[in-house]
Amino acid sequence: NNTISVLFSDCIYSVTDVNSQLDNAKNATTDAFLTALAKNSTMATIILQFVSSFDGYYYDRNDKPYVCKSPRPFYVVITGNRDALKTLYTDFKVKTMPGLKNKSFFTSESWTLNENNACAIISDYTNARRIKTQRNFLDIDDVSLDRNASSLQFAIGVDYSGIFVDDDYVLDKSNYQIEPDCFRVVGVSKASPSAIGDFSNIPSKPYAIVISVPNGSFAPMITLSLRKVIPAWVKKSNVNDDAGFVPASTKSFAIQKMVEGIAAAYSEDYDNYYKLTVDINKYNK
């Protein structure tokens, strides 16, 4: 229910045989989270990366000590009921805590988006002469193209207020998948004030996902999804082998393996946060 668990750790696996033991540790992490999720499917996890001053010894994977008097990263891993974590994150103003560098949210859930929380944006982000939506504000009836443009650009609005996902993750266009392949997500931003009026209901957390497609590659339907993938900051913070040195102040030995172990459990049932379909009836030249 409202009980949460908080782990403070450097999140460094204590292993010597990097090649075999790290994968075993990753798999054990996945199994532990799968076991917990089987008991409570609404259990979510937040991982916070902080950097603080440090004065002590850093031990590499061979347990060799190195004097370290420079900033080091540490992690706060919070698990519990999704709604309880959302309350904690807001009430404790986690986003503004000193030393916070990165964060990630994990949930086993996937959400359904429709005309109540998504729309085709007709006012901004487009080079079309006009976009006319159908009555549901999401599907497009017709697009009047700019004949001088080499591609069509437009945007889909999504209200993320009900989805358990980090703001920085939402803004990374590489986390999105769109079909057909000729369509591309070229940018993501908070929705402009005028775009908010394109929603059927006033959104609490509106974002605009900008899409581009070359002229001549149009399709009658597109499918947009926000994938559950390892956040970019995790890969940037990872060191595969720390033997013989102290990693940089924002990097940790094998942190990617630990996060991959957690993420694998949370993507077991759904590999996306949502999947949204938009029909486009007509393209007018």
Per-range role (PLM):
Residues 1-285:
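Acidic, low-complexity intrinsically disordered regions
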